[in-house]
From Swiss-Prot:
Residues annotated to bind ATP: 67-74
Protein name: Cytosolic Fe-S cluster assembly factor NBP35
Keywords attached to this entry: 4Fe-4S, ATP-binding, Cytoplasm, Iron, Iron-sulfur, Metal-binding, Nucleotide-binding
Note: Although plant and algal NBP35 proteins lack the characteristic CXXC motif in the C-terminus, thought to be required for Fe-S cluster binding, they can bind a [4Fe-4S] cluster in the C-terminus. Also, in this linage, no CFD1 partner protein homolog as found in other eukaryotes can be found.
Result when mutating residue 31 to G: Impairs [4Fe-4S] cluster binding
Cofactor binding note from Swiss-Prot or TrEMBL: Binds 3 [4Fe-4S] clusters per homodimer. Contains two stable clusters in the N-termini and one labile, bridging cluster between subunits of the homodimer.
Cofactor: [4Fe-4S] cluster
Reported function: Component of the cytosolic iron-sulfur (Fe-S) protein assembly (CIA) machinery. Required for maturation of extramitochondrial Fe-S proteins. Functions as a Fe-S scaffold, mediating the de novo assembly of an Fe-S cluster and its transfer to target apoproteins. Essential for embryo development.
Organism: Arabidopsis thaliana
Domain of life: Eukaryota
């Protein structure tokens, strides 16, 4: 039971656990919570006061959500943080995906540890203006499973919010776990009083993913978190033709033969201009209209599509920004366009 919440099994005329008469009034007689309410400390939760003080130095707070796992939410969170840092903003990235912390890998910070100073826990820094906090920095090894129930997860989220010293930062990006679970309720409860800019929801095009995204949108509306928009990730596979592998199927044996060199040689000889085109294919069924149609139906902004790009996957594996080295020629422009809709007043640097 959180401070101030009336328990579901309370008596009909419950005065509320924060009332001076909590556990003492006539209406409390026979209530299963009578003793707990009578002895509970009254007044504001001191942790919420501490969180408000910490968050007072954070200008903007953005939640990154998804209905399902595996849709690229953490990849988007990482690249959003890289992009904001590339705009010369001071950025913090908080990973509250307690059971699946992939942010340390995607920021190139595996093996790093949290340090403590007289100001609190210090984030692990990728760059001078990009700090990261994750439970991944607290595990003895990256294969260690986190088997925690809700209260312990909520306790760590609260500790991240009240004990991590970010300093004066422009953006705090919060990478949440998929779905709508204890972690989501906690982060909203703790952050909403301090001001949340809103949530970006990441999905893939197929209906099986969008079903859960609708629930995510509904959650945001119920708890009062603005939906900044929905990103359709993995919107078709796109890559330069010269990077495509060509296979000849041997139907009799079920095996296949790599004929890539033969195909590229043939194109180079007979149609070299085709080597510069981009090959695209639909990976997920978007016949239902995808995220764009869902956004129209639910009245939330559609931020855009990000194609499935092997180079973006490689950047995530290597913990690098997709906006550097001009390698993510397919995905980087799409991500840049989406991020500029969220942060319209700032132009991204190349």
């Amino acid at each position: 039971m959180e401070n101030g919440d009336i328990p579901e099994d309370a008596n009909e005329h419950c005065p509320g656990p924060q009332s001076e008469s909590a556990g003492k009034s006539d209406s409390c007689a026979g209530c299963p919570n009578q003793e707990a309410c009578a002895t509970a400390p009254k007044g504001p939760d001191p942790d919420l006061v501490a969180i408000a003080e910490r968050m007072s130095t954070v200008k903007h707070k953005i939640l990154v959500l998804s209905g399902k796992g595996g849709v690229g939410k953490s990849t988007f969170s990482a690249q959003l943080s890289f992009a904001l840092a590339g705009m010369d903003h001071q950025v913090g990235l908080m990973d509250i995906d307690i059971c699946g912390p992939s942010i340390p890998k995607m920021l190139g910070l595996e093996g790093q540890e949290i340090h403590q100073s007289n100001l609190g826990w210090s984030p692990v820094y990728v760059e001078d203006n990009l700090g990261v906090m994750s439970i991944g920095f607290m595990l003895p090894n990256s294969d260690e499973a986190v088997i925690w129930r809700g209260p312990r997860k909520n306790g760590l989220i609260k500790q991240f919010l009240k004990d991590v010293y970010w300093g004066e930062i422009d953006y705090l990006v919060v990478d949440a776990p998929p779905g709508t679970s204890d972690e989501h309720i906690s982060i909203v409860q703790y952050l909403l009083p301090t001001g949340i800019d809103g949530a970006i929801i990441v999905t893939t095009p197929q209906e099986v993913s969008l079903i859960d995204v609708r629930k995510e949108v509904s959650f945001c509306k119920k708890v009062g978190v603005p939906v900044l928009g929905v990103v359709e990730n993995m919107s078709g596979l796109s890559q330069p033709l010269k990077d495509v592998k060509f296979m000849k199927l041997a139907t009799e044996t079920g095996s296949s033969i790599n004929v890539t060199e033969d195909v590229i040689a043939c194109l180079r000889k007979n149609a070299p201009e085709l080597l510069d085109i981009v090959a695209c294919s639909e990976v997920f069924d978007s016949s239902g209209g995808g995220a764009e149609r869902m956004c129209r139906e639910m009245g939330v902004p559609f931020l855009g599509k990000v194609p499935m790009d092997p180079q973006l996957c490689k950047a995530a594996e290597q913990g690098k920004s997709c906006f550097e080295d001009n390698k993510c020629l397919i995905s980087a422009p799409a991500l840049k366009s989406i991020i500029q809709k969220v942060v319209p007043s700032t132009v991204m640097t190349e």
